[in-house]
Amino acid sequence: MVLSKTVSESDVSIHSTFASRYVRNSLPRFEMPENSIPKEAAYQIINDELMLDGNPRLNLASFVTTWMEPECDKLMMESINKNYVDMDEYPVTTELQNRCVNMIARLFNAPLGDGEAAVGVGTVGSSEAIMLAGLAFKRQWQNKRKAQGLPYDKPNIVTGANVQVCWEKFARYFEVELKEVNLREDYYVMDPVKAVEMVDENTICVAAILGSTLTGEFEDVKLLNDLLVEKNKQTGWDTPIHVDAASGGFIAPFLYPELEWDFRLPLVKSINVSGHKYGLVYAGIGWVVWRTKTDLPDELIFHINYLGADQPTFTLNFSKGSSQVIAQYYQLIRLGFEGYRNVMDNCRENMMVLRQGLEKTGRFKIVSKENGVPLVAFSLKDSSRHNEFEVAHTLRRFGWIVPAYTMPADAQHVTVLRVVIREDFSRTLAERLVADFEKVLHELDTLPARVHAKMANGKVNGVKKTPEETQREVTAYWKKLLETKKTNKNTIC
């Protein structure tokens, strides 16, 4: 006699996920479910949802690394369960971080002797690195003001209006006035002359960007240093410089070694760089290094011993994974100076291919410079019928993610598209992207203008509008339209 289970008694674990009840139910969104589900079902359901994400390799908005060698992937997975802060338990991991700090500090020409340890720390990204550097500047300034018997309650920091949002966060979170140098059309970085004019006795530092997020351009740190040296002599101040090299720190030493932007300049006291950008490591790893030990106040360093040994620490968070630190060391020794230079050369060459291809269409004005971070920022020469937001939106149908955005004050009327060239963006992809841009433009040309029916002659309600006002209205319209499409879950494209 053969014994068998009926269908109703069958073990659900043998069912295909798509033959089970789990795909018939909505996924939990607000509360943890009461019952468990098989691991295969959990994986399949989540994996299916993630298919609707964009392809990271085609996300040309991001500077962040999206490809690493399989050997490095393996190293990262093998160390994914190591908590970096357990320094006594994982001393080799700590040693690898120290080696990275020393290599990066010397790459940036820190004044170190043979065998002398550099001062720096690994972070979860440049945002944390900038917070730490800013806190060091603020404490140094406060200590000096206290010693002189002067007020120390109104610190400020001078930057360009093109800074990344982490600078605004630092200013707001740590109560520092942010003094921004406004941009102007065709000059989208901080003007060193205007920056130095804004410096006063309460300025804790001037922040220069080596690789603007908006256009990839390097700010003139050498000129800023020279002007600030002169002002310090005249006033008796000692206002220092921080270089935000999040994007450019792993580019300039290899492509532009003669460019003076780092610790070769006497007023540069600290530098941050993103390992997860052109340091060629997956998100999130950043670094901040100081010129000398005296540039990092001792009172900001904590000492703990409840993990088994005395451990100095200067971070905003505590626990974090070790994988990215290990991956950074892998890249530094795997590629070496030669390898990094080759990667950056390739990025620059592919940037030029894309730049020249876009210029040949005759439809775009290139806003970015040839030197700097390998990216192309560009605007439509004629946006009277269709604008940059519409181009970016239509391009998504081909799989490409290309951002469109407006410039900061006083260049808000300028809208640009930006393509970041990363290590894994080949010449073939660059040529394909140009072809897809041409398809998008041809398609848009065959459509009626969606916005300018009322504005065809630059008039609304009988009032003549300037081109800048018209462009701002068009931009605002498209921003609102795209946000509506993103939030409307029932939209069918």
Swiss-Prot record:
Keywords assigned by UniProt, alphabetized: Calmodulin-binding, Decarboxylase, Lyase, Phosphoprotein, Pyridoxal phosphate
GO molecular function: calmodulin binding; glutamate decarboxylase activity; pyridoxal phosphate binding
Description of what induces expression: Up-regulated by salt treatment and hypoxia.
GO-annotated cellular components: mitochondrion
Record's catalysed reaction(s): L-glutamate + H(+) = 4-aminobutanoate + CO2
Pfam families recorded: Pyridoxal_deC
Tissue: Expressed in flowers and shoots. Detected at low levels in siliques, stems, leaves and roots.
Protein name: Glutamate decarboxylase 4
